[in-house]
């Protein structure tokens, strides 16, 4: 099968690999029908994910059809349409029992797919702990509607939940990339008094204004002043930092009112400074974290009910054997791209040389 592979820092390559097989009785093999590229894939490419293993197939956003299941898998069966959770989790350790599946203590727990074990930018993927890592897609929900459930939408859902948003709050979201917009969709469910999105890209700012007219939009240069003008207590009650740029961490806590909650959703390429003398007296509560993907079934129900729709984010589609072009467009933010879908079962004829060690 074709599989997009992490070779070394700065280099991914499309290679031929064997179709994965069941290794554990709790595994499932999924035929990938639709996948996507995430900014975390770019972090691997750029060397910002030290745990990433060279030689693995990248990709952790995907939906597909179950092909095989291990003897102990009971929740799914061959032929089922499923979302694949970005997190691998046992469901039994201290953290899993408390809903913190990102911190699963299993050796392959947490973010493993497409990082430490083979992921889904391929024709097939092996999913450990399939009873927990796969969720049924309702018949009325398309692959496109379900595509982002297992990662960026689950990230936004988790971030909105831990941010303790109330209906009286002014909420600032920094960043209107794919994860930022997914976060926005989940914050909208909380019905806060006011939502402000800070985004430097004119195209993405325009997207937010057109799609979500009830949301206020600011640019980074004027964000603090904009927030002060549009909040009641000297800043935002809740700030969600989803951009991960060089200056956005400071912008996040700088725009927060005293005693606010600042939730760090972004993954940074470089260490960030925590200038405690400057922050003294603001009494901020910081929350950090990658996705704890334990809400996928609830998210799928919300999609089925028409309360969440991420399909406008999918601006481009490519067959798997054109994934290099898909990455070029996504990484360089060309052609108004927000999210790229990779069609795993649609492959244009091409000859790929097998890898020789």
Locate the predicted segments by residue.
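C-terminal hydrophobic helical "lid"/dimerization subdomain
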Residues: 1, 200, 250-254, 293-357
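Glycine-rich beta-strand-centered segment in the early N-terminal region that forms part
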Residues: 20-35, 48-97, 138-141
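Cysteine-cluster motifs in flexible loop/terminal segments that predominantly coordinate metals
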Residues: 38, 75, 85-135, 139
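Short, flexible surface segments
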Residues: 75-78, 167, 258
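Local beta-strand N-terminus motif with an aromatic residue
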Residues: 79, 168, 214, 235-236, ...
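Mid-domain Rossmann-like dinucleotide-binding core that forms the NAD(H)/NADP(H) cofactor-binding site
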Residues: 139-221
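Glycine-rich cofactor phosphate-binding loops and adjacent beta1-alpha1 units
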Residues: 163, 188, 205-285, 347-352
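Conserved acidic E/D residue at the C-terminus of a beta-strand in Rossmann-like folds
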Residues: 199, 266, 290
